[in-house]
Amino acid sequence: MSQKQEEENPAEETGEEKQDTQEKEGILPEKAEEAKLKAKYPSLGQKPGGSDFLMKRLQKGQKYFDSGDYNMAKAKMKNKQLPSAGPDKNLVTGDHIPTPQDLPQRKSSLVTSKLAGGQVE
């Protein structure tokens, strides 16, 4: 029984060795490509923060996308002060449902519609 285990272990080791060599061969082309790119573009990868232009723009402060963003930021600075309503605070709307008789007469249009001409050819 011990002989069978010893026979199985060398087979497993050779399988693991094959995987290791395949991984090493797979890594070598990647390393070669990285070396080529580093030789071609030596300035890449040196600054973790990005380019000087980007760092300068980030140091200037917050920029707003449009006037809506600016107004929202401005409103936050005012500590959320809500504008007070005028003297009509007790005004209730929606208690009367209009009917066709309550509505004023519709004004006639000065320009006649081409669709309402009524002429059929």
From Swiss-Prot:
This is Alpha-endosulfine. It is found in: Cytoplasm. The modification Phosphothreonine is found at residue 21. It comes from Sus scrofa (Pig). Residues 16-37 have a biased composition (Basic and acidic residues). The lineage of its organism: Eukaryota, Metazoa, Chordata, Craniata, Vertebrata. One of its GO terms (biological process) is G2/M transition of mitotic cell cycle. Belongs to the endosulfine family. The N-terminus is blocked. Keywords: Acetylation, Cell cycle, Cell division, Cytoplasm, Mitosis, Phosphoprotein, Protein phosphatase inhibitor. It holds the Pfam family Endosulfine. GO terms for molecular function: phosphatase inhibitor activity; protein phosphatase 2A binding; protein phosphatase inhibitor activity; protein phosphatase regulator activity. One of its GO terms (cellular component) is cytoplasm. The modification N-acetylserine is found at residue 2. Protein phosphatase inhibitor that specifically inhibits protein phosphatase 2A (PP2A) during mitosis. When phosphorylated at Ser-67 during mitosis, specifically interacts with PPP2R2D (PR55-delta) and inhibits its activity, leading to inactivation of PP2A, an essential condition to keep cyclin-B1-CDK1 activity high during M phase. Also acts as a stimulator of insulin secretion by interacting with sulfonylurea receptor (ABCC8), thereby preventing sulfonylurea from binding to its receptor and reducing K(ATP) channel currents. Transmembrane segments: none annotated. Residues 1-53, 79-121 are annotated as: Disordered. Interacts (when phosphorylated at Ser-67) with PPP2R2D. Interacts with ABCC8. Interacts with SNCA; interaction is disrupted when phosphorylated at Ser-109. The modification Phosphoserine is found at residues 2, 43, 67, 109.
